[in-house]
Amino acid sequence: MKKTLMVVVAMLTSLTAAFANDYGKYYQNLPVKMEQPVLATIPDYSVNLTDFGAVGDGLTLNTEAFEKAIKDLDKKGGGHLIVPQGIWLTGLISLKDNIDLHLEKNAIILATPDRTQHFKTKDGVRDKKCSPLISASKRKNISITGEGIIDGNGAVWRPVKRSKVSDVEWKQYNEMGGTQTDGGKLWFPFNLKHFGNIADTPQAQESLRTHLIRLT
């Protein structure tokens, strides 16, 4: 669930490439032919995530800061949300029309390991399934650009086969807590030491794992 952003997602006909950068170099000398995506039309207005109280220490939850920044951009008709260098721990990010989420080099958007933060709520009622870390529904002119990283924190979501990891890695997983099944051949991030479950069984919890990014 980790993805380096060189040229990533956009919406409708607007798969995007650029905000103050030339991504053409990433299309040179490829083993297969790829067309560069069509640029989204983003207003010439920008805000920095830190303007809304975000702290890039990898520990502070910045969900509210993302919400405030996107709300500000939406009021202005859109623009660029600059995510500077740092590790920006967050829950769900919901993009709106005409917004470019731009990750500068060495910027990491890190999904919170608290899985309870990955549900949307309406009128105080929580959805039955987790939502993608970054999403948008029925929106237009959305782009995600830059040379940063979006890290979905997959270690707290996906099961691990004993045969696929080293002894050191296996020990590290089990130090998180978790549950072994299949005679110790499979580890699930269920009953972790520091984070609660979101289902009654390891298998049911695994079925709730969702996409990193979804634009519909």
Where on the chain are the PLM-derived regions?
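Extracellular "leader-to-stem" segments immediately downstream of a signal peptide or signal-anchor
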Residues: 2-82, 87-100, 104-216
